[in-house]
């Protein structure tokens, strides 16, 4: 199962999302990144697939480009539409308590809380990462290191770290019994 979920708008940051996915796969290992166009099979219910992957990842990266808040074909902002997939992805991730990391690309700036619909307001309080063309490799390396450290910490917590407790009457560090 993928460890990282990339949420993006195709008409805003698809190229950046693909480049990021490739870089993270190289850094974190094959199969570590979920991106819809790469990981949803033809004929599969994409809404169910997205929800399934969101439930099983360690972190969600929200790609924010210059047109991320722009209006859709109907004229209103897409994020204001409850059926917008980007909105659904972010709201689901925020509600689950998963780490949600805004990734600013193409010179985009972080949206203010007032610019976001209520279910997404928490996104504005997340520390963002900037990926720029001028320093892509260094920016990607920092992000990959942070994601790798986060996943390692989660794995250790999930597996449970066992300590050895000394038997009664034994000094600390002496052979003892396991504690969970």
Q: Model-derived features: where do they sit?
A:
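Conserved N-terminal substructure of TIR/SEFIR domains
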Residues: 1-67, 73-76, 82, 86, ...
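Short, charged/polar surface micro-motifs in flexible loops or helix N-caps
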Residues: 66-70, 107-110
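Conserved beta-strand/loop subsegment of P-loop NTPase cores
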Residues: 100-103
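Glycine-rich, charge-decorated loop segments at or immediately adjacent to ligand/cofactor-binding or catalytic sites
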Residues: 108-121
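A short helix-turn-beta junction within AAA+ P-loop NTPase domains corresponding to the substrate/partner-engaging
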Residues: 124-125
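Short acidic-hydrophobic, aromatic-tinged amphipathic segments that line or gate anion-handling sites
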Residues: 128-132
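Juxtacatalytic C-terminal regulatory tail of Ser/Thr protein kinases
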Residues: 150-163
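C-terminal or otherwise distal, non-catalytic regulatory regions appended to signaling enzyme catalytic cores
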Residues: 161-180
